[in-house]
């Protein structure tokens, strides 16, 4: 009996070690939160333990002398100071090891960079109001975010590389400032191509949707795999993520059924050493469709087949 118990314990230890090493080398899920008041709080989002990265969306007014403005849809009213409570959610996420970024831009808004000096002004604003600096008017309260996400979809195509350099330089003052980006899948991205060439970005979640030449369509994975390979071999970034809509209605096109992602696409993209996981738009649609729950284990582990072999 004792030998059998010992054998079972050794088997469980072996499984644990394999799963743990696979997870370390594997990926995670990034989610966009903030654009629907019915998607739950930031604290609730992170308490699901499904996400490794959360992008707060969006700071969609800034640059060219404008007073910066954050838009969190139905969650809170920043103009009345009603979003400072979000600091509680930020800290709750960070305690669990989840990185939280502020996302700049989005599909709708008034944002641009007019010059290198303008980029410096925006960087200073972000540092003082959301990162490690000091300001009496921090829109999300006193919590210090982990970094800044670039989701630039219109406006100027210039000076985003300067903004990245200025923000990255703040890492020298203590806590690292993570830089992330959500370019469109056509390569190179019109707005962020130059910025990504700086090599300063830690995580790049490419949007493989709303762009038929580089997305999944009707059973055909060739376009999305070819585009993935182009991105992973062409830019110098820490990790690259497969950006997808979390439900069919979350995007105009490019939705990938979970079974297709798990059986056909993930095995291909995991071959890249730059594989970081999957990005989903957005928390609201993920709640409706349960997408992250369907794919989580497959995203996390690089070598799930090894666990099956041991079992």
Swiss-Prot record:
Propeptide stretch(es), residue numbers: 300-311
Localization per Swiss-Prot or TrEMBL: Vacuole
Residue stretches making up the GH18 domain: 27-302
Pfam family, one: Glyco_hydro_18
InterPro entries: Cts1-like, Glyco_hydro18_cat, Glyco_hydro_18_chit_AS, Glycoside_hydrolase_SF, Glycosyl_Hydrlase18_Chitinase
Keywords: Carbohydrate metabolism, Chitin degradation, Disulfide bond, Glycosidase, Hydrolase, Multifunctional enzyme, Polysaccharide degradation, Signal, Vacuole
Segments forming a coiled coil: none
Enzyme's top EC category: hydrolase
Chief location bin: other
EC number, UniProt record: 3.2.1.14, 3.2.1.17
Disulfide linkage: 46-93, 76-83, 185-214
Catalyzed chemical reaction(s): Random endo-hydrolysis of N-acetyl-beta-D-glucosaminide (1->4)-beta-linkages in chitin and chitodextrins; Hydrolysis of (1->4)-beta-linkages between N-acetylmuramic acid and N-acetyl-D-glucosamine residues in a peptidoglycan and between N-acetyl-D-glucosamine residues in chitodextrins
Superkingdom of origin: Eukaryota
Active site as annotated: 153
A biological process from GO: polysaccharide catabolic process
Gene Ontology CC annotations of this record: extracellular region; vacuole
GO molecular function annotations of the record: chitinase activity; endochitinase activity; lysozyme activity
Signal peptide span: 1-26
Family under the similarity heading: Belongs to the glycosyl hydrolase 18 family. Chitinase class II subfamily.
Extra information: Two components of hevamine have been isolated: hevamine A (shown here), the most abundant, and hevamine B.
Function per UniProt: Bifunctional enzyme with lysozyme / chitinase activity. May have a role in plugging the latex vessel and cessation of latex flow.
Name the record gives this protein: Hevamine-A
Source organism per UniProt: Hevea brasiliensis (Para rubber tree)
């Amino acid at each position: 009996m004792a030998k059998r118990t010992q054998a079972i314990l050794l088997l469980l230890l072996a499984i644990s070690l394999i799963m743990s090493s696979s997870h370390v080398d594997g990926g995670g899920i990034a989610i966009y939160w903030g654009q629907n008041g019915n998607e739950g709080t930031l604290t609730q989002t992170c308490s699901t333990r499904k996400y490794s990265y959360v992008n707060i969306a969006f700071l969609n007014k800034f640059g060219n002398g404008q007073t910066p403005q954050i838009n969190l849809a139905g969650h809170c009213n920043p103009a009345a100071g009603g979003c400072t409570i979000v600091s509680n959610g930020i800290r709750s996420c960070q305690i669990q090891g989840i990185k939280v970024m502020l996302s700049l831009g989005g599909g709708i808004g008034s944002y641009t960079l007019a010059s290198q000096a303008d980029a410096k002004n925006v960087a200073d604003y972000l540092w003082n109001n959301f990162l490690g600096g000091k300001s009496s008017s921090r829109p999300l309260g006193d919590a210090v975010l982990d970094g800044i996400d670039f989701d630039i979809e219109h406006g100027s195509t210039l000076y985003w590389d300067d903004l990245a350099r200025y923000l990255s330089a703040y890492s020298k003052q203590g806590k690292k400032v993570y830089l992330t980006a959500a370019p469109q899948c056509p390569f190179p991205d019109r707005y962020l191509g130059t910025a990504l060439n700086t090599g300063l970005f830690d995580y790049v979640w490419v949007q493989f949707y709303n762009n038929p030449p580089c997305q999944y369509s009707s059973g055909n994975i060739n376009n999305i795999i070819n585009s993935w390979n182009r991105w992973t071999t062409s830019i110098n970034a820490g990790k690259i993520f497969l950006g997808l809509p979390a439900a069919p209605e979350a995007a105009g096109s490019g939705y990938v059924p979970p079974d297709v992602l798990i059986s056909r696409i993930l095995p291909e993209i995991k071959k890249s050493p730059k594989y970081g996981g999957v990005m989903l738009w957005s928390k609201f649609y993920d709640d409706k469709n349960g997408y992250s729950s369907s794919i989580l284990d497959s995203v996390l582990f690089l070598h799930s087949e090894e666990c099956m072999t041991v079992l």
